[in-house]
């Protein structure tokens, strides 16, 4: 018999999108990034969070109706990325190197993976912060 803790209640069921690894454009992104060394993919606050160690380097919405991929780049890469009309500065975190990109299908997934690879490499090189 499993011990029951007071106040825990019955947990919620896992949403189908989570159990399948995403839906819409998130699924191919999750499949690709899941094969990269050291990448951890976890749902957080309505978005897929892409981590290297404890460092968040990108996030994408869980809902298939939303398409805004957020990527954290180095400041040099951010300047390079913003030369492309399809990429815009993040509405709140542009000062920290974040950019946004609409990912609705295969053409944008290729572009996104190129910038995600740069973000992953930069995040993997950064030293872990002491907590």
Residue ranges and their predicted role:
Residues 1-131:
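Charge-dense, helix-prone N-terminal extensions
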């Amino acid at each position: 018999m499993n011990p029951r803790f007071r106040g825990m209640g019955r947990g919620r069921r896992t949403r189908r999108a989570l159990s399948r690894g995403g839906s819409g454009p998130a699924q191919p992104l999750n499949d690709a990034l899941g094969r990269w060394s050291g990448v951890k993919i976890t749902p957080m606050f309505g978005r897929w969070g892409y981590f290297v160690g404890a460092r968040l380097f990108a996030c994408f919405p869980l809902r298939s109706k939303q398409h805004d991929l957020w990527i954290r780049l180095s400041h040099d890469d951010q300047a390079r990325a913003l030369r492309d009309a399809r990429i815009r500065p993040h509405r709140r975190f542009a000062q920290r190197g974040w950019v946004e990109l609409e990912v609705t299908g295969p053409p944008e997934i290729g572009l996104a993976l190129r910038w995600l690879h740069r973000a992953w490499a930069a995040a993997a090189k950064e030293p872990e912060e002491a907590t």
